[in-house]
Amino acid sequence: MENTAQAVKSKIEVKNLNFYYGKFHAIRNVNMSIRENKVTAFIGPSGCGKSTLLRTFNRMFELYPGQRAEGEILLDGENLLTSKTDISLIRAKVGMVFQKPTPFPMSIYDNIAFGVRLFERLSKGEMDERVEWALSKAALWNEVKDKIHQSGNSLSGGQQQRLCIARGVAIKPEVLLLDEPCSALDPISTAKIEELIAELKHEYTVVIVTHNMQQAARCSDYTAYMYLGELMEFGATDQIFVKPARKETEDYITGRFG
């Protein structure tokens, strides 16, 4: 795996990462390289630390008291965990979509425009173009173009999640984090999200947390298996699912554990 992986540029380098909820040591000495324009999946049983790890990539944990990260997370060589790094710039470069669709209580149009207005000064025409572009990227434009000024909450669950993805890409980030984006969706909506992920990786580096191992196998280029806060195995998805190096990984993937 490493020979193949090294041919692909690393977008995010994680070095000696430890994470704490108060005194609880939740992530232990994680080292990994997230490849550019690839999909990386984090798998593992509930409570293993995969969502916690994901949220260190844009310092989302800082919204909650008592949580802290130690080590380095390098985005194109810049350590995101230093106090010198502007948190607003991190959030502009690293977008995030959560498990439950979370449209803002405003129109579909304003859901997309909201984040853009924080970082850019666009004319009305430019904003209209950006909104259409983002909704098109999320394969949603044709479904909502005639009701763009209706509430985002009027959409179905699957449409709401694609709206959140459109909102994430509207600010043109470099990395998109997806925290179990399909867990609350029906199979048809899930299939649309998976198709969307395959398209998004051509322009973004995508990291997805999923409990669905079939989804990880279908969608990702690389897979990380975590257990009790430790990175047990990380490699090309084909290798992880067909010939894992560790018995613990095989036991989890085959359903004998977890």
UniProtKB/Swiss-Prot annotation:
Keyword annotations of the record: ATP-binding, Cell inner membrane, Cell membrane, Membrane, Nucleotide-binding, Phosphate transport, Translocase, Transport
Protein's name in the database: Phosphate import ATP-binding protein PstB
Subunit field text: The complex is composed of two ATP-binding proteins (PstB), two transmembrane proteins (PstC and PstA) and a solute-binding protein (PstS).
SMART domains hit by this protein: AAA
Sites where the protein binds ATP: G44, P45, S46, G47, C48, G49, K50, S51
Reactions this protein catalyses: phosphate(out) + ATP + H2O = ADP + 2 phosphate(in) + H(+)
GO molecular function annotation: ATP binding; ATP hydrolysis activity; ATPase-coupled phosphate ion transmembrane transporter activity
Membrane topology (UniProt): Peripheral membrane protein
GO biological process: phosphate ion transmembrane transport
Biological function: Part of the ABC transporter complex PstSACB involved in phosphate import. Responsible for energy coupling to the transport system.
Domain of life of the organism encoding this protein: Bacteria
EC number: 7.3.2.1
Localization in the cell: Cell inner membrane
Domain ABC transporter intervals: 12-253
Cellular component, GO, one term: plasma membrane
PROSITE patterns: ABC_TRANSPORTER_1 (PS00211), ABC_TRANSPORTER_2 (PS50893), PSTB (PS51238)
Family the UniProt entry places it in: Belongs to the ABC transporter superfamily. Phosphate importer (TC 3.A.1.7) family.
Classification via NCBIfam families: 3a0107s01c2
